[in-house]
Amino acid sequence: MELAKTKTGEMIDLNFARKVVEENKRVKDNRGRQEIVLFNGLTTSKLRNLLELINHVYTKVYNSDDTTLSEDVRDELEYLKVKFAYESGREPAVRTFIEKTYVDKLVDVVLKKNTKKIFLDYCKYFEALVAYAKFYRMGD
């Protein structure tokens, strides 16, 4: 599964998801106890809210027999970009997450390729980001 490439030519796939989360983790000392911080303070609830937006569209696409994305789904993906922009403006940690993981730019890739498969791959990538975020917060 390869969704796209970064400006440096690195493939954006499930391995990239692990790598980008790992590279954006830091340990913060909070009154004598160490706390793992991802993407400059991205909270689990904020990350899950973003995933919920994608899962709403995922359900429609997954249950469809079409191999291409319907106009309704394409409209929802366009709106998803708006939501990403809004959340980025409200929360610097969300902006960092979106910029480092390319989740907003990948929506454009999904819209351009317009296939069910590429959208489902995008969902897997986003789920991997959430899974690795959970893993690295609990680990170490």
Curated annotation (Swiss-Prot):
Part of the Csm effector complex that includes Cas10, Csm2, Csm3, Csm4 and Csm5. It comes from Enterococcus italicus (strain DSM 15952 / CCUG 50447 / LMG 22039 / TP 1.5). The keyword RNA-binding applies. This is CRISPR system Cms protein Csm2. GO terms for molecular function: RNA binding. It holds the Pfam family Csm2_III-A. The lineage of its organism: Bacteria, Bacillati, Bacillota, Bacilli, Lactobacillales. CRISPR (clustered regularly interspaced short palindromic repeat) is an adaptive immune system that provides protection against mobile genetic elements (viruses, transposable elements and conjugative plasmids). CRISPR clusters contain spacers, sequences complementary to antecedent mobile elements, and target invading nucleic acids. CRISPR clusters are transcribed and processed into CRISPR RNA (crRNA). This subunit may be involved in monitoring complementarity of crRNA and target RNA. The gene is csm2. Belongs to the CRISPR-associated Csm2 family.
